[in-house]
């Protein structure tokens, strides 16, 4: 499952991290891969040292493991993915921004290799956006980009802070590109701040908050 954003600062890393945690808690043996080359953040959010130096992945708990792809490791990603697929039930990949995706899929540079793999072999891609005007513009651009290419994964949309999403913008966006799911994710600054302070996931620090329940709902549907 690839997790990427229509633009920067839409919470895709937080979503990928918490979905991986929820899947692990549901009993799925789960690997979370940080392939956001421009701004890797998962190790920082979890206060982990030298994750990028691991040959394969680092086990965090019985069902959750973490990996970080670097330029040096990108060439061997296909082999890593094959081995991981034989060991894990579920693999989440933080892709960072998906802007200019069609160009990336024809690019032979190292930074595009994971996106190419996801486009050809993943089951799902979850795109994150917000209700901010500029983010909505970037999302529309991405959906137009998607309509011009053929990729294997089902595409879903997670809209952060979006209580009015369906009422206001739903018909415009869904007519641009068909989405398998559209999820509305509530904003909870307190829960997010607590998770960042404790360097962990929402399931560990605020299990009953609406935001955590939203993550659990998504994980249940896509696993």
Stretches found by the model and what they are:
Residues 97-103, 122-140, 164-166:
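Conserved Switch II/interswitch segment of TRAFAC-class P-loop GTPases
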Residues 90, 123-127, 181-183:
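Well-ordered beta-strand positions
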Residues 1, 50-51, 75, 147-150, ...:
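Acidic-aromatic/histidine active-site loop/patch
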Residues 161-166, 170-204, 215:
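Beta-strand-loop-alpha "switch" segments that mediate conformational coupling across diverse proteins
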Residues 115-116, 136-155:
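Conserved C-terminal guanine-recognition region of P-loop GTPase G domains, centered on the G4
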Residues 65-117:
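Phosphate-binding/switch loop-helix module in NTP-utilizing enzymes
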Residues 2-4, 33, 67-68, 92-94, ...:
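Conserved beta-strand segments of the P-loop GTPase G domain that flank and frequently precede/overlap
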Residues 1-60:
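Walker A/P-loop NTP-binding active-site region of P-loop NTPases
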